[in-house]
Amino acid sequence: MKNVLIHKGATYKTRSNRRRKVRTPSGKLVNRRVKKHSKKHRCHECNAILGSIARMRPAEFSRQKVSARRVNRPYGATTCGRCVREKIISAFLGNEERIVMEKTGAAAGG
């Protein structure tokens, strides 16, 4: 392919200013700006991929509606469902254990 002029923006070859040559339907060659790709969101606990959260750069991500940014549950934007389930169960069991200890301590003391 032949060289194509860059008409808009900076001409520097940097990571944030990448361009790709594209042939338009009319047969003209133009330079299109290529966006930087974003990484997939991951669970903060087990590092599993959070599949249902939109994958895009932070500025674009902040403009998305809430349903695209997180899942509708506690810790939906940062933690996977498995880790949330484990958190809830461990908190519940810890609470139950504390109540049992209080009851047995009161029965032994009183």
Swiss-Prot record:
It comes from the Eukaryota. Residues 30-41 have a biased composition (Basic residues). The keyword Flavoprotein does not apply. One of its GO terms (cellular component) is ribonucleoprotein complex. Residues 1-41 are annotated as: Disordered. The keyword RNA-binding does not apply. PROSITE patterns: RIBOSOMAL_L34E. One of its GO terms (biological process) is translation. Keywords: Ribonucleoprotein, Ribosomal protein. It holds the Pfam family Ribosomal_L34e. One of its GO terms (molecular function) is structural constituent of ribosome. InterPro entries: Ribosomal_eL34, Ribosomal_eL34_C_sf, Ribosomal_eL34_CS. Signal peptide: none annotated. Belongs to the eukaryotic ribosomal protein eL34 family. This is Large ribosomal subunit protein eL34. It comes from Encephalitozoon cuniculi (strain GB-M1) (Microsporidian parasite).
